[in-house]
Structure formats: C-alpha cells, structure tokens
Amino acid sequence: MPIPVDTAQSISKKRKRKHGGNARKEEAAAPAATEAVIESPEKEEVTVEKKKAKKEKSKKQKVEHMSSDEEQKNTEESEQEASDNEEEKSDAEETPAANGEDLPSADTIRLPQQDGDPVKFTELGLSEKTMKGIEGMGFETMTEVQRRTIPPLLAGRDVLGAAKTGSGKTLSFLIPAIEMLSALRFKPRNGTGAIIVSPTRELALQIFGQVRELLAHHSQTYGIVIGGANRRAEAEKLMKGVNLLVATPGRLLDHLQNTQGFVFKNLRTLIIDEADRILEVGFEDEMRQIAKILPSENRQTMLFSATQTTKVEDLARISLRPGPLYINVDHRKEHSTVEGLEQGYVICEADKRFLLLFSFLKRNLKKKIIVFLSSCNSVKYYGELLNYIDLPVLDLHGKQKQQKRTNTFFEFCNAKQGTLICTDVAARGLDIPAVDWIIQFDPPDDPRDYIHRVGRTARGSNGKGRSLMFLQPSEVGFLKHLKEARVPVVEFDFPTQKIVNVQSQLEKLIGQNYYLNKSAKEGYRSYLQAYASHSLRSVFDVHKLDLVKVSKGFGFSTPPRIDIQLGSSLKDKPPQGRRNYGSQPGSKFKRKHNDD
C-alpha cells in the first residue's frame, strides 16, 4: 500500500491539532506583526526617518516573535517525543500472541518528502534508530542507486530496479522496509511485515547480516529461512513472530504452505532480490506460487534485477501493482561493468592452464583472489590439490553442507588475503570485501555470467580491482560477445619463462595418490560435461577440445577412462542455458553446473 507523503497543508492541519490553542494564538498574532510592518500611506507628513525607525522596530518585533514561537514549538515537540517514547516502550513490553493481531491502518503514516535527490542518509529524514544503525555500519553518503530508489520507496511506490552488482542496492530496499516496520510499530504478535526473497543461501545470509546491523536499535524481530537449515527451528521462530524475514524461494514456499502459526496476513513489503537469478536457477514456479499466496492488498513490492529478461518482466507483472516506478542506473553508463575494474584475458593452451594458475597464485600470496570454475567436482579437486602441495586455498560449491558453506564464506570475507575457489554459487550478489583479483579459470556461460563474476571486485563507489579470464585459442570468439555486451577487456601477457613448470611432478603425484587420482577423474569428467552444456556452442564446442591437453591440466599424462558420452546427440540438441543448484534438470546431460 502506498504510504502517503505530507503536504504543506496536511502538516499545517496536524500542527493545529497537535498544539491546540497555542497554534490558534500564533495564527492570530501573525497578522498583527504584519500590520506593524505595513504603515498606512495616508500619513504623508511622517518623515522618511520615522518610517525607517518604525520598520526597524517592526522587524525586531517580528524576529523576537518568531524566536519565541520556535522555542515554544521545540518545547512542545520534545514533550510529544518523550510521550511517544514512553508509549513505544510500554508497547514493546506486551507479550506476543500466537494467532497474530491485525495492525492499525497505515494511512496515518507520513514520511518526509525530499526536494531533489538527497546525497547523504541524514537528508532522508529517517528515524533516529535507523540512522544509528547506518552510522554503525560506517555509511554516510549514498550511492546512485540509493539516491534514486530510497525516496520513492519511503513514499510507498512499487519499484522495478536495474542495477549492477556492487551498487549498494541492498541498503536501498532494507532501509524503506525497516522504516515501514518501525512506523507501524510491528510487534511479534503482528507476524511478518516484510519478506526478502534471495536466490542463494549465501546471499540470504549476507542480507541477514545487514538486517541485523540496521535493526540493532529497533525492537522489531527478524529471522532467516533457507534450504539446508533446521526446518523445525525455523518454524518455531516463525510461530513466535518474525517481523522481517529473509528467505530462499523453496524454503519460503514450504513454510507458507505447511507451517501453522506462520502469520503473514499483515505483510506490507515484499522484496525480490536478484530476480533474474532466482528465475535462472529454476524457481519460476515457486515464485508464482509465493506471489499468489502472499496478500497483495496494502503491499508494496520491490523487485531488483541486474538484467531485464522476459521472465523478469512476467514476474514483475504478477507481483507489482500497476504503474511501478522503473529505475535503471546503468543505461547511461558506457560500460556494463563497474568503473575502477581493470579487465583482461590470457590465451592459453589447455595443457598450460593449471601451470599458469599455479604460478599466478604463487606470485600473489598476499592478495585476495577468487577463482571461478564450472563444476563442483573441479572445485573439489583443485582445492584438494593446491592444499596438498602447500598452496592454501578455500573452496565453496553447492555439494557442501550448508554449515560448511557458511563457515567458508565468512572465513574468506574476514580474511585480508587468500584464495577462494568456487563455482558460480558465489557469483551473484555476495559482497566480499576487498577482493583484488577475479580469475575466471573456466570461461563463463555468457556475458551476463561474466559481468556477475567480475562484480565480486571493485565494489562500492570507489572500488578498485582486476579480472583475468583464461581462454583457449578455440574460445577467442567469446571476446566478440563481450564487446557486444559493452565489456572492455584487454589481453594480458604472461612471459613463458615466469610460468613454473611442475607438470612432471603433478603427473607423478596424481599417478601415485589414489584419492587425488579419483578426485582428478571426477573433476575432468565434470569439466567435459559442463563444457558440453555451454549455451554458446558456436564458441565453446566440446568436439574441438584436445582431450590430451585437457587431461594434462588435471594432472594426467594421457586422458583417463571415464564414464561419459559426448556423442552426436549433443549436436542436434538445442542450446540450453546453465542451471544452478536447486533446479531439477530433466536431460541426460544435466547442466553446466552438473553437480552444483
């Protein structure tokens, strides 16, 4: 429901009601002051000096009158604020009821209207408790997406926003949602007033962390429901009352359908973050059901997406009210990636890929680096291999248990240096501080995936970072697709003499170590399956791969025998986009993230 904004007239009426007789006395006194300034023109004999003296006197009276009014107003406002605080405190002490309680109408809420785009958070007229949370997070100045989205969201508009990753959009939707909960004085017994839907567990956890910081000084409750977590514990918390809920689509739908005592009839705000990614990973049906179950009356919806697709537009139609505000902060930019990002590629034969990666990581031990691979088994193998040869790395992929993924993610976030090897599970939305390098060891599925991968570095308004993509000679056609997507890349040159040649030692190790050999075979098999499911098959043709060279990149002297078919059936199969974990592939050759 749109939250109306105060006009000058409504503010005046409120002031009359608030101050009662005092306000009327002030209005009655105002004409007298005006009359004192304007002298009758009929008295022509009054000298110029007298007129000047009278004007000076009247001005002085007017200033004194205004200052006394301000003092009186400030006194009354402080008294009113004190009574409001006492009332809020007594409300917070009430015990929550399990069956949920209707909220009073939101029609009385008034939020400040801004003249022009504000620059600092202090200009938004936010509540003192929210401002304390923002200051505690160390923010003062807003990013462009925050300047353009927060004011209309505070005014109750539905918003469809397009912004690059790293633009600061998380605060753009959290601040209005929290202000709404605070203004309506949500309590546990009122149930859930705001829901944030996120495509991945890691992104949901990150949003939840920012929610915790922003709500540190508020009395409203908050919680998170994600796949892989304890469902019973989540249900118990929902029944007690969670005012702001962060969720992944599958688990949210589960609770909406099956958790009795989950009160969401008072929902006022629905936020869909990374909508394109939610749909890409196979949650289209879940989102349609969620939109149908949640109450739409009096609901404000915010939908954010880095890219605009037909499916995103369809989701917007069923979830947003007619006439939403569309905000695109990227259309005026020359490039699709953030400024401050130096992007390059290196052309490298398949048998030299690991040697180059190993040499690069060895030379940059003091840097913070993320390496993207195409499958879970590849991540698992290279993580085990590098740690075994004393090059410490962390690994993150969809086959890990949720607790392991969470621990790894936060360990890397808090580290000042180190390497994280991961699948695209970490490529969307996650805000990992101070990443120096993004290494795309396995090429992305398309330019959109490239943009989201490199979005992990150079984040924020003044962020700096570098990106390096490995390409085989047969894959240089991908550069044309990047150029069409307005992605500026230049070729990086790595002198051959600086590449550490450990191929013979690697092959010997893989030949002798049973567990590494088994892991290498699984990684090799998954790499080929992922390559075969590329959507850009004109560029990434699995039949053009030199399997001898590819196998050397996994530590084999000759290609191992593996159970896989890459026959002619793929030639006739229409291109299929990559699917991520959480989806249900229906074909024999599943998805590029076959084991995500």
From Swiss-Prot:
Residues 77-94 have a biased composition (Acidic residues). It comes from Aspergillus oryzae (strain ATCC 42149 / RIB 40) (Yellow koji mold). Residues 1-119, 565-596 are annotated as: Disordered. Its EC number is 3.6.4.13. Residues 42-95 form a coiled coil. Belongs to the DEAD box helicase family. DDX18/HAS1 subfamily. Residues 29-39 have a biased composition (Low complexity). This is ATP-dependent RNA helicase has1.
